[in-house]
């Protein structure tokens, strides 16, 4: 008997921070066919990188079943971290190549766990360059920031 086909979900994420650290917010758009869901949240105090990570984590944790995911972020920190750096961090006990503890390790570990049920393809786009979904994710992140001032 064949495995049921996994749904294909498209996700766009963004984070925002007023001051770094300062109040911050994150936003995410999840799209499955014609169904679209928007998520947002925030923290105070926080950093922009933490909000970028939390946007991706929150979107992936919102998925109710295993999916094939195309996740688009404007954060090189998130994309490089999850597609390149994380493998050595894990091998080195969550330490960088110069033996320092990985920054935001709590969120990197949470993102690593959130990925497990899914097949995720990571995409990067330039922020604030007129990409409609990225602009909307940015608006959601700013709303999340405003709610956490």
Swiss-Prot record:
The RNase H type-1 domain, residue ranges: 5-146
Alphabetical UniProt keywords: Cytoplasm, Endonuclease, Hydrolase, Magnesium, Metal-binding, Nuclease
This enzyme's EC code(s): 3.1.26.4
Cofactor: Mg(2+)
Sequence positions that bind Mg(2+) 1: 14, 52, 74
Any Pfam family: RNase_H
Cofactor note: Binds 1 Mg(2+) ion per subunit. May bind a second metal ion at a regulatory site, or after substrate binding.
CDD domains: RNase_HI_prokaryote_like
Function: Endonuclease that specifically degrades the RNA of RNA-DNA hybrids.
Family classification: Belongs to the RNase H family.
Protein name in UniProt: Ribonuclease H
Native source species: Afipia carboxidovorans (strain ATCC 49405 / DSM 1227 / KCTC 32145 / OM5)
Lineage: Bacteria, Pseudomonadati, Pseudomonadota, Alphaproteobacteria, Hyphomicrobiales
Gene that this sequence comes from: rnhA
């Amino acid at each position: 008997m064949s495995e049921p086909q996994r749904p294909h979900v498209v996700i766009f994420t963004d984070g925002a921070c007023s001051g770094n650290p300062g109040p911050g917010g994150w936003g995410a758009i999840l799209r499955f066919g014609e169904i679209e869901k928007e998520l947002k949240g925030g923290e105070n105090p926080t950093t922009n990188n933490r909000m970028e990570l939390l946007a991706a984590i929150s979107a992936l944790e919102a998925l109710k079943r295993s999916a094939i995911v195309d996740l688009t972020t404007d954060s090189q920190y998130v994309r490089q971290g999850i597609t390149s750096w994380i493998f050595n961090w894990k091998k080195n006990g969550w330490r960088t190549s110069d033996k320092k503890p990985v920054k935001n390790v709590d969120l990197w570990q949470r993102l690593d766990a959130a990925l497990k049920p899914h097949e995720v393809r990571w995409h990067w786009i330039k922020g604030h360059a007129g990409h409609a979904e990225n602009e909307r994710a940015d608006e959601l992140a700013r709303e999340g920031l405003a709610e956490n001032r």
